[in-house]
Structures are given as C-alpha cells and as structure tokens.
C-alpha cells in the first residue's frame, strides 16, 4: 500500500485529484478513470492505493475538509489584528460553511456544496469522517465568534449554522442567483454590531 516516498506521492496525487473532481462535480465526478487521468497516473493506481472508490472518496472529502479548516484558521489569525467588524466575521463564517468558492456569488458553487453535504447522508462510509470532523469545524466557528466578541455555546452555534443552512436552502429552492447573499443577510441580522 505505498509505504515509499514515491508511493506516498502517488497516493497523495490521487487524493488531490479526487478532491479537485469532488469540488468541480460532486461525488459522481469521482471515478477511478477520472481520478487517475487527473493525477496523471495509470488507472490501476487507484485500486492499488485505495481498497475501494468509497475509500478514495472519503480521503478526498477529508483532504478538502482539512484544507478548508486550515485556510479558515489562517484567515482567523490574519483577521485577529484587524478591526473587528461584523461583516468580516460573517464572511469568515460563510467561507467555513459554504466554502470560499461561494464568495464570487452565483448559484453553482453553493448548490454543489449542499448537494455534497446532503449526498453524504446516502454514503454511510462518510458518516464516521463527518462525525469526527464536525467538532473541529464547531471549534473553529466558536473561536471565530469569540474573537469577534460574540461568544456562543454549542447550542447557539448550532442555531446559527441552522440559520445559514435554512437561508441557503430557501435561496436554492427559489433559484436565487446568490444564495450566499441570502445567508449573509440572515447571519448579519443575527450577530450584527
């Protein structure tokens, strides 16, 4: 299972490729052939380094999630020295919940993300990963709010996340061209200055 440096690099290239495909096209885009082609590796490498497509997909989700958490942590550290405006906090929270790709507005990035989140419920192999990563996201969100003098407990945090999710789902149902803007408006009203 690839214990060598070369093997580790190849495995990581497959994970990177699968994560890119996941971001671009959701779970349906993560296929052995597509991942191998994106990574520039032979098709057989996907089954050599991963026992199943589910294992590869799980590695892609974890890789993407950890990268987003690391980016969120860096942004929080960068913003710590800046003036503390509610709008900055809201954008950070929305990046963590909706993904930075949603910043440019538009329906597609948010729709794809929510399809992936809801679709995870149909992929039981992702449940342990999602459960294990949720506290990390909650911790970063809680710390973000606290640094902006808006301390919340876990129940309050879950209500804010549900508020964002509700605003986004309503916007998606209505084919709103900018669901992030709808979530921004609701979140600003909830935590405003």
Task: Give the residues covered by each predicted segment.
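Solvent-exposed, amphipathic alpha-helical segments
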Residues: 13, 17-25, 71, 75-78, ...
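Hydrophobic alpha-helical connector segments
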Residues: 70-110, 157-160
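Hydrophobic/aromatic residues within well-ordered alpha-helical segments
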Residues: 10, 53, 60, 64, ...
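Generic hydrophobic, amphipathic alpha-helix propensity
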Residues: 9-19, 35, 60-64, 68, ...
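Amphipathic alpha-helical packing segments from all-alpha helical-bundle domains
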Residues: 69-70, 104-114, 121-148, 155-158, ...
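Hydrophobic/aromatic-rich alpha-helical bundle segments in the mid-to-C-terminal region
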Residues: 126-131, 146-193
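Helix-turn-helix
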Residues: 13, 21-59
């Amino acid at each position: 299972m690839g214990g060598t440096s070369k093997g580790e690099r190849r495995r990581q290239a497959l994970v990177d490729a699968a994560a890119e495909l996941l971001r671009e096209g959701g779970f349906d885009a993560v296929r052995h052939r597509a991942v191998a082609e994106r990574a520039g590796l032979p098709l057989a490498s996907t089954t050599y380094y991963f026992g199943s497509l589910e294992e590869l997909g799980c590695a892609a989700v974890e890789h993407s999630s950890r990268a987003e958490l690391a980016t969120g942590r860096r942004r929080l550290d960068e913003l710590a020295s800046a003036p503390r405006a509610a709008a900055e906090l809201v954008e950070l929270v929305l990046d963590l919940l909706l993904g930075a790709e949603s910043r440019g507005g538009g329906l597609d990035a948010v729709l794809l993300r929510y399809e992936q989140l809801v679709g995870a419920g149909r992929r039981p192999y992702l449940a342990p990963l999602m459960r294990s990563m949720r506290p990390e996201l909650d911790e970063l969100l809680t710390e973000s709010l606290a640094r902006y003098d808006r301390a919340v407990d876990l129940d309050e945090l879950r209500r804010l996340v549900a508020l964002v999710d509700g605003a986004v789902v309503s916007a998606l149902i209505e084919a709103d061209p900018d669901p992030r803007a709808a979530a921004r408006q609701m979140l600003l009203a909830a935590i405003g200055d």
